[in-house]
């Protein structure tokens, strides 16, 4: 008889789901996470957040380099799991693995599928100015986030959210949805439903996706700033100095796109439509600072100098 869960996950987003399964007494047969990766200037190996939790809780752990490794697949089969739960694992599972668990491989995806299929649904929902997003549990098939839907939960996005804070919220709501999903599957009261409605995509962000185009509206730039924090961060150039724009707010008014119209105690910049007040900014190689701190160390000419 199949029993127990294999958990696939890697970053901080997956931690609440694993902890929720542990705290309610689920039998975790194995935790699968990505190999340790070099990080930072020293390129020191850093363990994924899920590995840290697994080690703290004394859970069996595996970090395969390849998904199609015969020994790894044999190990999974020998565990005879009831479920595999997949939360931001970061690799595509091959068909041989998808067929192992009794109830299939259940994925938690951070959007209301079929909207925002792909690797960066939280970021793109913010960049596109969505007011509502959510989480979906689904049965993984061989496509990219194309499998049948089990459950969904909506949450609203507010103007204070960025990709970091929204990820935290969705990870908690998602953990609750994972528990609800496995409970209902055990009772046989969920019918997987094919995805219907408009399909949109959320590809992995690249560094260049953060480049600010001041010919966009203030609201559009504001959304870009929120959606790209903490990585890759929205950025622009001032007198050939590259700066990251960390937090902003939209104001009414008009000025030429990119033109700095206030630079005494605050930093206000023109856009194609509306004005943008920069609240937090990060010069290259420096810490995040307030606009006032940034201004105090520079000579900026109001009405003459521009971001580009």
Swiss-Prot record:
Protein name listed in UniProt: Methionyl-tRNA formyltransferase
Keyword Transferase found: yes
Keywords, ordered alphabetically: Protein biosynthesis, Transferase
Residue numbers binding (6S)-5,6,7,8-tetrahydrofolate: 111-114
Reaction equation(s) it catalyzes: L-methionyl-tRNA(fMet) + (6R)-10-formyltetrahydrofolate = N-formyl-L-methionyl-tRNA(fMet) + (6S)-5,6,7,8-tetrahydrofolate + H(+)
Enzyme class: transferase
Keyword Phosphoprotein: no
One Pfam entry name: Formyl_trans_N
Disulfide linkage: none
Top-level division of the source organism's lineage: Bacteria
GO MF entries: methionyl-tRNA formyltransferase activity
Task of the protein: Attaches a formyl group to the free amino group of methionyl-tRNA(fMet). The formyl group appears to play a dual role in the initiator identity of N-formylmethionyl-tRNA by promoting its recognition by IF2 and preventing the misappropriation of this tRNA by the elongation apparatus.
Gene source species: Thermodesulfovibrio yellowstonii (strain ATCC 51303 / DSM 11347 / YP87)
One cellular component term from this protein's GO annotations in UniProt: cytosol
Family affiliation: Belongs to the Fmt family.
Gene3D superfamilies in UniProt: 3.40.50.12230
EC number: 2.1.2.9
Example GO BP: conversion of methionyl-tRNA to N-formyl-methionyl-tRNA
């Amino acid at each position: 008889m199949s029993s127990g869960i294999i958990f696939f996950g890697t970053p901080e987003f997956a931690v609440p789901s694993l902890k929720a399964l542990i705290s309610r007494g689920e039998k975790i047969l194995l935790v699968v996470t990505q190999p340790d990766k070099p990080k930072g200037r020293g390129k020191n190996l850093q363990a994924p957040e899920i590995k840290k939790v697994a080690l703290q809780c004394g859970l069996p752990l595996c970090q395969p380099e390849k998904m199609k490794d015969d020994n790894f697949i044999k190990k999974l089969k020998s565990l005879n799991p009831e479920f595999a739960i997949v939360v931001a694992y970061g690799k595509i599972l091959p068909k041989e693995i998808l067929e192992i668990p009794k109830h299939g491989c259940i994925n938690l995806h951070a959007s209301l599928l079929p909207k925002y299929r792909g690797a960066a649904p939280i970021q793109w929902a913010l960049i596109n100015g969505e007011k509502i997003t959510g989480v979906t549990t689904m049965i993984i098939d061989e496509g990219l986030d194309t499998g049948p839907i089990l459950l969904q939960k909506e949450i609203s996005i507010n103007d204070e959210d960025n990709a970091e804070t929204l990820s935290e919220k969705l990870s908690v709501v998602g953990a609750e949805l994972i528990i609800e999903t496995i409970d209902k599957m055990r009772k046989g009261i969920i019918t997987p439903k094919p995805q219907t409605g408009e399909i949109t995509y959320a590809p992995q962000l690249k560094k260049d996706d953060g480049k600010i185009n001041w010919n966009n509206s203030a609201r559009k730039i504001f959304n870009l700033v929120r959606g790209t924090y903490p990585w890759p961060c929205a950025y622009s150039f001032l007198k050939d100095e590259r700066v990251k724009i960390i937090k902003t707010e939209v104001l009414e008014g008009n000025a030429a796109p990119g033109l700095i119209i206030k630079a005494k105690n605050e930093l206000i910049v023109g856009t194609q439509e509306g004005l943008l007040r920069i609240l937090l900014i990060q010069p290259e190689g420096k810490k995040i600072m307030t606009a006032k701190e940034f201004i105090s160390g520079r000579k900026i000419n109001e009405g003459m100098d521009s971001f580009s």
